[in-house]
Each structure stands twice: as C-alpha cells, then as structure tokens.
Amino acid sequence: MRGKSRFSLGLVILAGALLFSLIGWGAGLYIEWLWFKTLNYQQVFLTRLTSEIGLRVLVGIIMFLLLLINLMLTRKSVLKAVESAKAFRPFQRDDDNVITINPNPQIDWREQITPGRLTLAFTLLSMALGFLYSSSVAGDWVTILQYFNQSSFNITDPIFNKNLGFYFFSLPFWHIVYRILASAIFLNIVLVALVYLVTDTARGGLAKIFRFPSARYHLSVLAALFFVIKSWGYRLDQYDLLYSSTGVVHGAGYTDIHATLLAYKALMILSLVTAIIIIANIFLNRFRLTAYAIGGLLVTSILLGSVYPAIIQKFVVLPNEFNREIPYIANNIKFSQQAYNLDKIEQKDFPAGRTLQAKDIQENKNTIDNIRLWDWQPLRQTYSQLQEMRLYYEFKNIDIDRYAIDEEYRQIMIAVREMNQDQLPQQAKTWINQRLKYTHGYGIAMSPVNEVSGEGLPHFFLKDIPPVASTNIKINRPEIYYGESDDGYVIVNTKTDEFDYPKGDGNSYSKYEGDSGVKVNSFFRKLLFAFTFADYKLLFTGDITNESQVLFYRNIKERIPKIAPFLSYDADPYPVINNQGEIYWMWDAYTISNMYPYSEPFDDRGNNYIRNSVKVTMNAYNGSVNFYISDAEDPIIKTYAKIFPGMFRPLSEMPEDLKKHIRYPEDMFLVQSRMYSLYHMTDPQVFYNREDKWTLPTEKVGEEEKAMDPYYTITVLPGEKNPEYLLIMPFNPQNKKNMIAWLGARSDGENYGKMVVYEFPKQELVYGPMQIEARIDQDTTISQQLSLWDQRGSSVIRGNLLVIPVEDSLLYVEPLYLQSEQSKMPELRRVIVASGDKIVMEPTLELALQKIYGEGAVLKDRPQQGVPPATDQPAGQQPAPEKTVKELAAEANRLYDDAQAKLKAGDWAGYGQSLNQLKDILTKLQNQSFSQ
C-alpha cells in the first residue's frame, strides 16, 4: 500500500507541475495577445501562433502515428515472447496447491505484460516521443510560410538554371521535410529493433531477426524506406554545392561540379539500389546481402564523396587552378555583386590633385559648417555632465542626424533623456516609485556637430527641462515612455501621480494620455499580470483603477523584434522630431539570408544576402509601431508582405516630416564596404591574384589604432549643385596606408540609396587616414603641445579623423578633447586640419582654415565658434577680478560638502543645484589651469 501511495503522490505532483506550467503558458499567451491587440498587430500574432502550433501539432501527430503503427506491428511478436516466457517461472503451483521449484529459475518482467498494458504503453510512448520531437520544428514556421508565399527573383543560377526563389524559399522547405522524414524513419527503425531484441524475438543477435518473418518484413520495409529518403537527400545535396567553400571562391567550383556533383548523382542511384536489395531480401532471407548493400553504400559514399573529390582537387585543379576555376570565379564575382547591390554602385574618377583655395572654402560654406567636430563618445560624457540634470536620467546614446535649422541644412547630434531607475538611491527603489511614479524620461538634448563655446562645450539647440529651444525645432511632447533604456514594466493612470520632471524646489507631475498599454480593468487581468511578471504586489496594491494601463516591452530593441522576429535590425536606432514636436524612433531593418548562390558570406553564420528593406518607426510617447517597405524590389520582403497582409506599408505612406530623416544605414553600408573592397575587381585574373584588393583604413582614437567607422557628413558631390547627406568610407590599397578611393551612400530625396565610388589616380599619392595620423605625431609643434597637456594632469582624447571631400580635393579634420583628472567632462579644445602638405592645430576649425588658406577663408556670416562670447560692460566699469586657483578649489570643496548634505537630507532639487554650481567652478578651475 505504501508503494501505491507514493506512486499516487508522484502522479499528483507531476500533474500539479504540468497544470502550473500550462497555466503559466496560457497566462503569458493571453497577455501577449492583449499586447499585440493594443498595437493593432493581432493578425500577425495569430498568424505566427497558428503557424507555429499548427506545425508542431502536425509533426507531432505524424511522428505519433508512425511510432504507434510500427510499435503495434511488433505487438504480436511481443505477446508471443511473453507467452513463451511463462514456461520459465521460478515457482510453479499445481492443482493440488503444491509448490515446486523450477530447475531454471529467473524472474521475467515480461510476465507482467498484458495485451491492454502493452497497447497503453505503446500509445503513451508514441505520444511522448511525438511531443518531444515536435519541438525540433518550433522555429521552422517562417520557412514553411515562405514556401507557400514565395516570390520570384527573376534571376537563375548558372549551374541548374533554377530561379533564385527556389534556393531562398523552396530548398530550405524541402530540407526541413527531408530532416523530418529521415529522422522519423530512423527513430522508428531503432525503436522497433530494440523491441524485437529486448523481447528475444531475435534471440542470438540482430542477424537472427531475419529468421523471423514478421521482424524481417517489418525492419526491411523501414530500412528500404529510409534509403529511398536518403536518395532524395543526395538530390538536395546537389543544390547545396552552390554554397560550397572548398574551392578558390565561395560557391561550386571545378571539383564540386566535376567530382562531387557526379558523386551525389551516383550515390542517389546507389541508395535506390540498396533499397531495392533490402526489399528483395525479404524473400531471399539473406542477412549478409542486406549488410553488404548497406556497407557498400557507406564505403562508396566515402570514396566518391571525399576521396575522389580530394584526388581531383589535388591532381587536376591545383596544378592549373586559375584556368580550371575561371568560370566559377566569374560566377562568384557576379552573384556576390548582386547579393550586396554592388553592381549598382556608380564608378567615377576623383582627381584629388587640386589644391584648395580660400574661395573654395567660402563657396563650400555648407560643407565646412557641417564638419563633425564632436564624436559621440566624448560628447555623451559631456551631455551627461551638462544635461542629465538628475541622477535618475540617462543619455543612453548619442545619435547623428540632419535638420533644416532656421532654413539652413545642418547636421546635429541628438540624445534622448531617458529614465534609469537603477540610478535611484537605494531607499527610493520602492515598488511604488519603480512601477507607478518614475515611469518615463523627459526631453531631448541637441547640438550642432561643429559649434563650440569658449569653454570647449557644445552649443545647444535644445536643452534643459522643460525643453528650451534656440532654433525653430520645438518639443511639444517631451515624455519618453519608450526608448533604449526602458526595460521594465510600469503602470500608468493610477491613483499615484507620475513624476514628470523636476521643477524648482519641487516636482511636476502628470497623467499618461496615451492608449498603448493593456488595461488592468478586472481582477482576472490583475491576476494574470501578477502571475506573468512574478509580482504579487500587483494583486494587493490599492493604486490601480479600471483606467490603469500596463506598459511593457518598452525597450525598442525588444518591442519591435517582438512583432517581427524574422527581420534583422541595425545596431543603432535614432530619435527624430516631427513637425508637431513629437519624438519618434527610427530603426533600420534588414532582410538577410544565407541562400544566395555563389555569393560570398559576410559573417560567421554564412549570411550572404542583405537588403535594407524596412524602415520602422516607434512613437516615444505612445509606443505605436509602423513598418514601411524601403526596398520594394526585395523578394524576401514581398514574401513577408504576403504572409502578413497589412503589416507593411509602402514608404510613400510615411509622413513627410519623418521621411526627411531616413538615412542610409551604417551596418549595411559597412558590410557593403567590406565586400566592395574585394568585389570592385570584375576581371577573374585580377580577382584571383588579388592584384587590386582594397582594405578599410584605420585611425588613431585615443592612444589606440582602430578600424575606421563609416561616418555621415553633408557635402556637395562633384558635378552636383546642392549639398546632401552622405555616408562615407575611405579605402586603402592592401598593405598600404595611402588612400585609393572613397565610397559614398546618398540619403536625401530621390537619390536615397544610390551609391557612388570615387577612385583616385593610382599614379598620385593621396594621404590615407593613418598617414595623416603619423604626420600629426611627427609635427613638433603639435606633439609638444599634447605632451604639455599630459604633464598638467589632463587626458588628451584624439577624436575621429574625418576625410571630407571638398570640390576636387580632400580636407582632413581631427578634433582634440581635454579631460581633467577631476572632471569626467571632455572639452573640445583644439582642431587639427590637414590639406595637401600643410597641417595645423588651432582652437577652432575657422582659425585652422585661415592659417592654411589665409584670411579669405573666413566664413563671414557666422561668428567663429570656440571664441568666448563678448560681454556687454557699462562704460567705464571694469570686470570683476577672477578668483585664484586656490579660491576656486576652496569653493569647489564647499559646494561638494553642501551637495552631499542635501543628498542625505533627500533634497533632490538642492542637490542638483549644488552639482550645477560645482560644475561651473570646476570648469573655471580647469580653464585657469590651461591658460597658465
């Protein structure tokens, strides 16, 4: 009885655990449904859910039926074995109730088997294995839907003459089908063989199975079916040769076509022959014949699949590799260019020999005014010190964009002030504060890329809380509920007022006016949220009302992939301000594949095709998300549009004030740049010898030499009239430091997406970035000044070196930042400019240009940046004398002690004011130190 009780208790515990898991899964699923519904993407949710569950159910049922049918076919043999086992009972009782001992005693578990129990066991085992096996196709729903909604590429491969859509959409589908069938049949063979062996149907070993007709018939049919499927697998392997990496280039080479392809064809036939032999052996009853057939196939697969191709490669290809591989190299060049859109890059010459004059600087004022002097890394630290305002605010990232500022095309740096609850003091990290009160960030900081104050700090177009604008850019909805930092859930429209922003000695509070959250308007929903978030406090708080909403998945890098996990995304979403003063996030999405024949992969996962097919926008206040198709020619996005009707909109439907801010994405441009460094060579001979291979340049950032990143700038392309927003990457020749070309991607208007490469004359020296860096290090005036700053306890931070095309020449610009040991606020103190053989370092870009080109290079209609602003003094009145370094240091210590006292007292407003005063004193102290 005790054993039965334990068994019953175990069943109860198991059932309880399963029920708990089922409730958790159901609660999470329902919450997901409500979330998708608030975003109007419920159809996307249903399509994904029904596809994934439907696929798993279908595969699970197929596996269940296959297993059950095959196990039931062994039932008769098992029951016979059970009957025969009864003759070997260790104890026997006769009719007179006399017990005798069996001379051959052994306890046999088969005596416990009854027909009913056996059927139940087979059914449960089949169900369990079918359920487990179904999980192997959990991520294949996208491939299945792509197969049934595929689009044409209008391009055929050069070997099998199939449309590329076959390789993108059909071949992966058939691989899944093959994998399911082959593994299912193999599992059935193993399981059935084990049943026959365990029940002693084949007493004496596997070979004895063939003495029993039922076992022989059963296993022979399964084995024959397996080799028929294997034959089909060899057919699929032939198409996979187009992704071979064994030759001189990626894709099918000479050996693949003349050896491996023939081997697969032969093995396909031999697999069918093996299946026929196995079926014939049902009647011949010769186990060795089956063993020889299978063994022969294995040996042949090794000889034909590995040894023969290796011999061809070594003795036929390698002695005359180029001539053998010419057509396949040409295929690789052609299809790699197509896969990365390199065949659409316009090629032009760039003389680069002309020396710029002062009038060239004046005539290209818009280009000069938009040269980026602020790098995002030091600027983020500076923004942090100047504009975070409170310890719980954070600038997660600094982004770059362009705006029409007072009717002038300007490149700007922009950052969103987000809420970081981790920075709250420990005593303030209560459930109310984290879930109900501190719910959102506030506002934006924006500054031009080139303007600097007299203290080496950025000049702000947008700043402070509430937002203060010095230009035509306004913020009317500064609250940030959705962004890059918002990872946790919050509840809005509760009885607790939401903290909006600090105001004087107190705070301003607000109520959420959006409808992007899921309402908690019933105890049932409250229970589901508490269960899903594992947060019991949701059940017992009295602050939640019927109008309360739960906002979750607020981080853009979680929210958007939750809707469209089948897309890939750029590393850097960026904020945009529309004409109504609302803040949006813009994010580039890619369609990526590893199924483009002959194309060279760009990553370790074998991906060899990329398109920036989608632009995604997300409202920072209400979290609404929209997907816009930016590359309507991409067959993959066409397929997704068929799968999810209504999800993707044409780019023409994007509001114009947002469309002005789309830009060519950096991640894709970097991939294309790396590929173009090799695939600009179209001649197979030149390509094979790597005679004209380019490399991406390096630069000196800080004290380290790093790979140069692509960068945005505003300039006028040669032959064009208007300035435009470009993404640029220079190139070096392989193993050289000089510059050979530069690639530009256009981002404005009708020219969006067009790419052009400008090549320099190969007979002329054009300085590359590291050559300019070397000249900076070798310049005695510059190096002495840098050493002097280092000796005074300041860190010198070398910014990104930018190569700026101006007319038919180049301008090299590198900013220098100083950061004291006490302050974490880098200041822009010098600008290095190189042009031709001249290199100078001055406090401002304007002064550097004047030193190179003369007074005529002054940009007259804009005051020089970096010069302390003049102050209006009444006549005859002298300015107050500056405090000494000692006095400033004492004042700094006093303010620090004052700030700490206010922090302990919980006076956040006073704490912030003291920190701002301390910052001003430290700035004055640093300036006096540098001037001495």
From Swiss-Prot:
Keywords: Cell membrane, Membrane, Transmembrane, Transmembrane helix. One of its GO terms (cellular component) is extracellular region. Belongs to the UPF0182 family. Residues 861-883 are annotated as: Disordered. It is found in: Cell membrane. This is UPF0182 protein Dred_1797. It is a multi-pass membrane protein. The chain crosses the membrane at residues 11-31, 53-73, 118-138, 180-200, 209-229, 264-284, 292-312. Its main location: membrane. It comes from Desulforamulus reducens (strain ATCC BAA-1160 / DSM 100696 / MI-1). PANTHER family: UPF0182 PROTEIN SLL1060 (PTHR39344:SF1).
